[in-house]
């Protein structure tokens, strides 16, 4: 909560915790303190700072899609649902559900064409919804068509309402150059440098710590980015085996630090995870 006591507690945790940490670091204090600890050899684990204002590490939104396999649709839906949230008090969830379906279909379609996440979002922003649906129905895979087939048959006014919902939530990814750079797949990533995904962070006992640094004055603007990343992290943690199962018995503990948590606003995925993740270590 930003008080002196909480700051001391969090910093002392950074000094003593020996397993992987992911920290939301609004003010940048935690990453600076950890850098000092590392320089003074008080800790040994390397670390990553994800900061769209000063891009050093890139985040790969599509890391799990590249695995393919039976969970491909689940991974697509996690991205779409994180970008387009559905408030618990929404009166007409139909339009949000359709917007999620449209974005899911577009993700599948453009991913299969070889576009990365930002490339997909740019195409969604630039293409009229009726034209996008028609293109996916005519040229997309069976999976992509399944997501948009109902939308393609709606009246133009209804399609426009769905498209407005999609474009409103994806606008920041298409217009903010810092976000585009932070979430784009670039040449350095091809060699395995500069890009990270939660799968490696969660599953590898030797993974680096990660500090998500988004300055307080950009929280409202970049809230969708943080929600996407945190949702993908929580879902990856939920896939860890139960800590008392044979597979989870040797699983190292994982620490998620939510510094300045109230500043993030309401994030249902975090609140729901408070109970589900206790058994995941």
Regions found by a protein language model. Give the residues of each.
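P-loop NTPase motor domains
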Residues: 1-280
């Amino acid at each position: 909560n930003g008080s002196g006591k909480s700051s001391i507690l969090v910093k002392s945790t950074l000094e003593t915790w020996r397993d992987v940490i992911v920290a939301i670091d609004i003010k940048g204090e935690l990453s600076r303190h950890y850098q000092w600890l590392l320089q003074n050899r008080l800790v040994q684990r390397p670390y990553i700072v994800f900061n769209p204002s000063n891009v050093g590490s890139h985040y790969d939104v599509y890391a799990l899609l590249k695995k393919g396999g039976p969970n491909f649709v689940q991974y697509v839906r996690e991205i779409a649902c994180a970008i387009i949230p559905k408030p618990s008090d929404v009166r007409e969830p139909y339009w949000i559900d359709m917007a999620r379906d449209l974005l899911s279909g577009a993700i599948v379609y453009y991913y299969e064409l070889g576009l990365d996440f930002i490339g997909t979002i740019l195409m969604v922003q630039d293409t009229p919804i009726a034209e996008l649906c028609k293109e996916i129905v005519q040229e997309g895979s069976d999976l992509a068509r399944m997501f948009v087939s109902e939308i393609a048959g709606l009246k133009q006014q209804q399609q426009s309402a769905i498209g407005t919902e999609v474009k409103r939530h994806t606008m920041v990814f298409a217009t903010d150059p810092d976000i585009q750079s932070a979430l784009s797949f670039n040449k350095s990533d091809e060699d395995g440098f500069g890009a990270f995904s939660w799968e490696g962070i969660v599953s590898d006992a030797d993974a680096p710590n990660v500090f998500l640094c988004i300055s307080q004055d950009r929280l409202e603007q970049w809230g969708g980015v943080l929600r996407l990343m945190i949702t993908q992290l929580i879902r990856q943690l939920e896939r860890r085996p139960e800590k008392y199962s044979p597979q989870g018995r040797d699983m190292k503990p994982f620490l998620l630090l939510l510094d300045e948590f109230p500043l993030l606003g309401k994030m249902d995925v975090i609140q729901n995870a408070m109970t589900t993740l206790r058994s995941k270590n």
